[in-house]
Amino acid sequence: MFVDHVKIYVKGGDGGDGMVAFRREKYVPNGGPAGGDGGHGGNVVFEVEEGLRTLMDFRYKRHFKAPRGEHGMSKGMHGKNAEDLIVKVPPGTVVMNEETNAVIADLVEHGQRAVIAKAGRGGRGNSRFATPANPAPELSEKGEPGQELNVILELKVLADVGLVGFPSVGKSTLLSVVSAAKPKIGAYHFTTIVPNLGMIETDDHRSFAMADLPGLIEGAHEGVGLGHQFLRHIERTRVIVHVIDMSGMEGRDPYEDYLTINEELKQYNLRLTERPQIIVANKMDMPDAEENLTAFRQKVGEDVQIFPISAVSRQGLKELLFAIADLLEVTPEFPLYDEVEEQSDATVMYKHEAKGEDFEITRDDDGTFIISGYAIERLFKMTDFSREDGIRRFARQLRAMGVDEALRERGAQDGDTVRLQEFEFEFVD
């Protein structure tokens, strides 16, 4: 498929920190813990907006970070949860994890949403840790960091205008001079082997997406040449621009080319013939082109509008682009009935990858034991090491998870260095 492609960074909002606080009211001596919880961060959510056509906006903004939750407050007041960050994407956007190439979401329908980066939960305040043995704990949690990752967005482009015609009639040249697209251009058939997309803006500031599709040949509806894939792509377009080589230099008759291409469109799917079609007579700067155009007009009829142009010399391009923009304004979207069968019964909305083991122990070249893993790193990030109670709780949780025992099994002895992210401590058996 013909895709737009961009890499971006997304990060869910961090949770707010829990607070250590105590009641200090008049006539209430020795007040208990009163620290509130932090609020949850915001998710990064992608939402399909049917009015969008390309990923061009992501070329200029590549970082999306949801807001963090509010910190907990005294008097048991919890921090406010953050709002989700909603990012609009065009229909047909596929979101993939850059590191694993796993598909996170396939977004196809207007209004469809998918959580791309999960928010962190808020840390608990000290009122959550009160026990009969420790009724006034100086202990709270930091907010959980939000999920962060680099993702790749690929768009199955829904072009407004599709350029069709035999190979080497000048479709790629036309696209290259009316847009910033840089398709491969060569004096041989099938130079274009993948579709190219160009964004066009007319002098009166109307814009549309134009696709240069690989050349069609007789039998394309049966898969001959570059076949079904690109005929299917024409089906996504609203207007077809039929480019014909009027120079006759390929040894073909322009009128026969015109009939052959239209027959292929008809044979592939009758609905393709419902698309408005603009006929473009290209290479009018070549010898014999005027004579061939006169003969062509006589065969198709004087009531059929033809736009004579030269993509190389840019003759007639302004009038052509205005005509295309005018036609798009009055042409509705065409439903893609055939694609319903290709989609799965349940559209992919959201998929998290497995979080893996709680912890893993490896050994560095210098003999240091390295602890890693989703659960233990999450615990580390949410621990407030500036407070003695926080350090003690962290040590208790390591023992409860079996980290001490696992270190002994790996040969750890008194005084050995153990590292967890940027934190180093000595192992005590």
UniProtKB/Swiss-Prot annotation:
Region (Disordered) residue spans: 119-143
InterPro entries found in the cross-reference section: G_OBG, GTP-bd, GTP-bd_Obg/CgtA, GTP-bd_prot_GTP1/OBG_C_sf, GTP1-OBG_CS, GTP1_OBG_dom, GTP1_OBG_dom_sf, OBG_GTPase
Keyword vocabulary terms for this entry: Cytoplasm, GTP-binding, Hydrolase, Magnesium, Metal-binding, Nucleotide-binding
Residue span, Obg domain: 1-158
Matches recorded under SUPFAM superfamilies: Obg GTP-binding protein C-terminal domain, Obg GTP-binding protein N-terminal domain, P-loop containing nucleoside triphosphate hydrolases
Function: An essential GTPase which binds GTP, GDP and possibly (p)ppGpp with moderate affinity, with high nucleotide exchange rates and a fairly low GTP hydrolysis rate. Plays a role in control of the cell cycle, stress response, ribosome biogenesis and in those bacteria that undergo differentiation, in morphogenesis control.
UniProt name for this protein: GTPase Obg
